[in-house]
Amino acid sequence: MFKYILKRLGLAVVAMFIVMSIVFFLVNATGNVPLSATSARDIAAVQAQLQEFGFNDPIIVRYFRYWAKLFSFQADALGIYYANPNQTIGEIVFARVPNTLYVVLISFLIGSLLGIFLGMVSGLNRGKFLDAAINVLVVLFVSIPSFVVGLGLLKLAGFLNLPPRFINFDDAFFSFDRFLLASIIPILSLVFYSSAAFTYRIRNEVVEVMNQDYIKTAKSKGLGMFAVARYHIFRNSIIPSIPLFVFGISGAFSGGFIIESLFGVQGVSRILIDSVQVNETNMVMFNILFIQGIPLLASVFIEFIYVLVDPRIRIANSSNVSLLTKLKFLSSRHQWLMKWNKINSDNAQNIVFNSPLHHQLLELNAIDYKTKTVQLTTEQKTALNISATANFILLGNKCLKLKTIHG
């Protein structure tokens, strides 16, 4: 299991590296710079700063310089925030992380729990009115974009006298009661989509599980529908749906881009959008690392949970050939091919298996299969009519080294 988790973690790191590399080249391909000038004096200063920050260097040079600095693990490893070099990127981003995590994680938690509940209810009532009603809602919430739902909820907020704007943690007039009221609309905007995805998946899994023989056996033993659903249907429906949690978290972060702009949430997504427009490369890269890193780490954690609850993965993983074994096999095969490439009609003699010559070699105890050699004296080679130029003996599908010994 440990090897399996390490493998998934390694794949996550590779995926993150590829994503960040693509983003780096896309952002720098725009040609924008994060510095601007309003006078002739400013132009000279800006040009000097561009030279200092390395913007005049080729993009490939800046790319390798970025990774070298990132892996230096120094205080400024994340790079410079060009708009305000006195403030570090970490300070700016982490000041807004609580707002993003609050909206995203709370909406994901509520959406997943609501989706699991509605999926169970819909699946257990397959073909009934309740199932049809839930399916209609699922189709609506999947089809309608989150920003359209958000605009509709803004109208609803005005009708219910709810705050239309989100109250951030660092607001000057922050109060807990107003904060909770202002959180309802942004969170609901993300809840509907995530709950719809969970509902659809869980409902299909429940329908499939209910057709299994062990469910019919449980019912025939006299178990009620609630007990069957609790002990048999729920667990066997959740296990195949575990990977959906990864997509749910990623979807919540993706939806957060629009929700933060729509409801005034001072989060990480707002920084990313602003930074892309002015080519704040270091800020963009760190935001991508943060926004994509959490779903990737969540995917590794969920893979770990998946291995614990589903023994089939452990069995499949234990039956796989390890990378070290594959490398050993390739190395031995390469050596075998190199040996056969050295063999030709001039330096090898073919001996048929179970032939008289083969039996004579056995009687002389000349064949050593362990060391893959045939050891003969010069007189024995002459008596057996073995060529004096032969260095190898081909016996069946084996290639044995011919050695001359002094008897």
From Swiss-Prot:
Q: Where are its TM segments located?
A: 9-29, 101-121, 134-154, 179-199, 238-258, 288-308
**GO CC terms:** plasma membrane
Q: Which InterPro entries does this one have?
A: BPD_transp_1_N (IPR045621), MetI-like (IPR000515), MetI-like_sf (IPR035906)
Q: What is this protein called?
A: Oligopeptide transport system permease protein OppB
* Pfam assignment, any one: BPD_transp_1
Q: Which domain of life is it from?
A: Bacteria
Set out the biological process GO terms recorded for this chain's protein: peptide transport; protein transport
**Principal location class:** membrane
Q: How does it assemble?
A: The complex is composed of two ATP-binding proteins (OppD and OppF), two transmembrane proteins (OppB and OppC) and a solute-binding protein (OppA).
Any one GO MF term held by the record is: transmembrane transporter activity
Keywords tagged on the record = Cell membrane, Membrane, Peptide transport, Protein transport, Transmembrane, Transmembrane helix, Transport
Compartments annotated for it: namely: Cell membrane
Return the similarity comment.
Answer: Belongs to the binding-protein-dependent transport system permease family. OppBC subfamily.
Q: Where is the ABC transmembrane type-1 domain?
A: 97-307
Topology with respect to the bilayer = Multi-pass membrane protein
What does the record give as the organism's lineage?
A: Bacteria, Bacillati, Mycoplasmatota, Mycoplasmoidales, Mycoplasmoidaceae
This molecule's function is given as: Part of the ABC transporter complex OppABCDF involved in the uptake of oligopeptides. Probably responsible for the translocation of the substrate across the membrane.
The family database entries (SUPFAM superfamilies) matched by this protein are listed as: MetI-like
